[in-house]
Curated annotation (Swiss-Prot):
Family: Belongs to the methyltransferase superfamily. Type-7 methyltransferase family.
PANTHER family: S-ADENOSYL-L-METHIONINE:CARBOXYL METHYLTRANSFERASE FAMILY PROTEIN
Cofactor binding summary note: Binds 1 Mg(2+) ion per subunit.
GO biological process, one term: alkaloid metabolic process
The keyword Methyltransferase belongs to this UniProt entry's keyword annotation: yes
UniProt pathway: Alkaloid biosynthesis
Binding site for Mg(2+): 178, 262-263
GO molecular function, one term: metal ion binding
Name of the molecule in the record: Monomethylxanthine methyltransferase 2
Gene coding for it: MXMT2
pH dependence text: Optimum pH is 8.
Length: 384
């Protein structure tokens, strides 16, 4: 089965769906000030046609209500900054392209658009038709838009997904090289970590080169992804998956060869690795780069626009929160895991993951690191 066929969130609106488990959480809330600053710099740059129509893309948008909450933040930031900077009575039209792979559940987003537009008009004063939302399916490691047609590209929790499993893992190192793990973890051998870093370097370089061509000169890009830091000693969500899978092997429910032959196309870079790749590729100037921590159960925070899921108790002990963590991780990773390990074992897998999450939460741990980077496309020499 092709990777792009299984690299998507759980579809629909069931208890294990991404739509029901993802939420506007504290991690995304921390991004909003950076988003506003990025929009402020964008509007000051006075790019072509920006006063009439601002063209934006959300790369790796996923599905469900959370997608439109990101769109809401972008629209609110544009309107807020526009009023502060230019005090314009006539707001520019905002055209937003939602991008993800072809198998993404775009329909779950489209169904929410009528109510989203009405709410935007009621709360932001944006008339229906002044914010245009459409889909642009396809891999963001390939071209999506015409040259010099976009003002702002946004991506949150997507660029850590690779275009493929590092080829060197199996071809050069052999099956089972990454023993006991499904990704490039702290426990992985140096050759495995290098194979993953090489693939990320190749993919992220391609990402920057391709999308720099789609942006106007001095256009902006804001990226957020999970990252690693040297002193970080807490298990992240993928470490919990490793623990749960190894439990099933020890208990005899899963063959060790199944784990040995599976590697997730996912890499958590360090801030320095990202910085070096951007500088080496050369199309962008780094405006700022920061890291911040988010907690596993950050999604328990309540957003007025996001009703809390009824099948979870918002306030409770570690076991209740651990169930939420397990369901959220399941909604993201189940399709690709089920394609390799089988659907039948998924309930047991995430039941064990919840137990490990509860232990981590009980110890007062359970954070993962995030990286946010703001980039400006360097002007061509003729534009200087």
């Amino acid at each position: 089965m092709e990777l792009q066929e299984v690299l998507h969130m759980n579809e629909g609106e069931g208890d294990t769906s991404y739509a029901k488990n993802a939420s506007y959480n504290l991690a995304l809330a921390k991004v909003k000030p950076f988003l506003e600053q990025c929009i402020r710099e964008l509007l000051r740059a006075n790019l072509p046609n920006i006063n009439k129509c601002i063209k934006v893309a959300d790369l790796g948008c996923a599905s469900g209500p959370n997608t439109l909450l990101t769109v809401r933040d972008i629209v609110q930031s544009i309107d807020k900054v526009g009023q502060e900077e230019k005090n314009e009575l006539e707001r520019p039209t905002i055209q937003i392209f939602l991008n993800d792979l072809f198998q993404n559940d775009f329909n779950s987003v489209f169904k929410l658009l009528p109510s989203f537009y009405r709410k935007l008009e009621k709360e932001n004063g944006r008339k229906i038709g002044s914010c245009l939302i459409s889909a642009m399916p396809g891999s963001f490691y390939g071209r999506l838009f015409p040259e010099e047609s976009m003002h702002f590209l946004h991506s949150c929790y997507s660029v850590h997904w690779l275009s493929q499993v590092p080829s060197g893992l199996v071809i050069e190192l052999g099956i089972g090289a990454n023993k006991g793990s499904i990704y490039s973890s702290k426990a992985s051998r140096p050759p495995v970590q290098k194979a993953y870093l090489d693939q990320f370097t190749k993919d992220f370089t391609t990402f920057l080169r391709i999308h720099s061509k789609e942006l106007f000169s001095r256009g902006r890009m804001l990226l957020t992804c999970i990252c690693k830091v040297d002193e970080y000693d807490e298990p992240n969500p993928l470490d919990l998956l490793d623990m749960a899978i190894n439990d099933l092997i020890v208990e005899g429910h899963l063959e060790e060869e199944k784990l040995a032959s599976f590697n997730l196309p996912f890499f958590t870079p360090s801030a320095e690795e990202v910085k070096c790749i951007v500088e080496e590729e050369g199309s962008f100037e780094i405006l700022y780069l920061e890291t911040f921590k988010a907690h596993y159960d950050a999604g328990f925070s309540i957003d007025d626009d996001y009703p809390v899921r009824s099948h979870f108790q918002v306030y409770g002990d570690e076991h209740i929160k651990a169930e939420y963590v397990a369901s959220l991780i399941r909604s993201v990773y189940e399709p690709i895991l089920a394609s390799h390990f089988g659907e039948a074992i998924m309930p047991d897998l995430f039941h064990r993951l919840a137990k490990h999450a509860a232990k981590v939460l009980h110890l007062g741990k359970g954070c993962y690191n995030n990286l946010i980077i703001s980039l400006a496309k360097k002007p061509e020499k003729s534009d200087v």
